[in-house]
């Protein structure tokens, strides 16, 4: 693993971004305003980020030759979203500094791990229960009450991979629809708005 803590970028440096979606596009536009170039790595043709990036590599995340070339042309590497294979991040970490680290990426890929990480660091989260089968879901509903939200632990984004439960009757259908994997049940929280924040820091 490369030592990441001492890296410093100056305008003109190239930031490698894994993923070519809307978040990659917004990151590339913001980086350009600061004088940085972005190299997008994505398996998708005609991705949103590719239209504004300095360079785009179109290849599978498992293509090590393409990943190596991508790393050689980047000064630092990051991701536009969390569903990047861990193996890809670990491979690239041997070649260039990768932020956030693959260990943090792994946490962000599982909602249960995210909740535990937050609570372990003193951050309050919505009351929740991990569930791996329908019996556990029924117990969780009795504990947390309804309305509640059933969410897949992995591959959920932009409202996908989740169902609002109004009672036990709706729980059965939701479980059959979503639970091909572990899930979490969250107590429903009334809210006025949702805020997304990207945080960066220097050394």
Give the label of every model feature segment:
Residues 107-196, 200-203:
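Active-site nucleotide/adenylate-binding loops and adjacent lid/helix of ATP-dependent enzymes
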Residues 1-109, 113, 135:
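ATP-binding N-terminal substructure of ATP-dependent carboxylate-amine bond-forming enzymes
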């Amino acid at each position: 693993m490369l030592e990441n803590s001492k890296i410093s970028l100056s305008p003109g440096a190239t930031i490698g971004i894994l993923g070519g979606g809307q978040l990659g596009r917004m990151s590339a536009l913001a980086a350009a305003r600061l004088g940085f170039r972005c190299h997008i790595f994505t398996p998708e043709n005609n991705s949103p980020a590719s239209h504004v990036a300095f360079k785009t590599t179109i290849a599978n995340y498992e293509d090590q030759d393409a990943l190596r070339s991508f790393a050689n042309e980047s000064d630092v590497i990051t991701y536009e979203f969390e569903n990047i294979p861990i193996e890809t991040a670990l491979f690239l970490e041997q070649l260039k500094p990768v932020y956030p680290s693959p260990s943090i990426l792994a946490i962000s890929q599982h909602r249960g791990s995210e909740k535990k990480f937050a609570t372990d660091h003193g951050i309050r989260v919505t009351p929740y229960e991990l569930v791996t089968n329908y019996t556990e879901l029924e117990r969780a509903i009795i504990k947390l009450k309804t309305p509640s939200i059933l969410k897949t632990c992995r591959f959920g984004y932009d409202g996908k991979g989740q169902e609002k439960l109004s009672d036990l009757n709706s729980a059965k259908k939701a479980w059959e629809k979503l639970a091909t994997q572990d899930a979490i049940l969250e107590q429903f929280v009334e809210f006025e708005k949702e805020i997304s924040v990207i945080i960066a820091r220097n050394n």
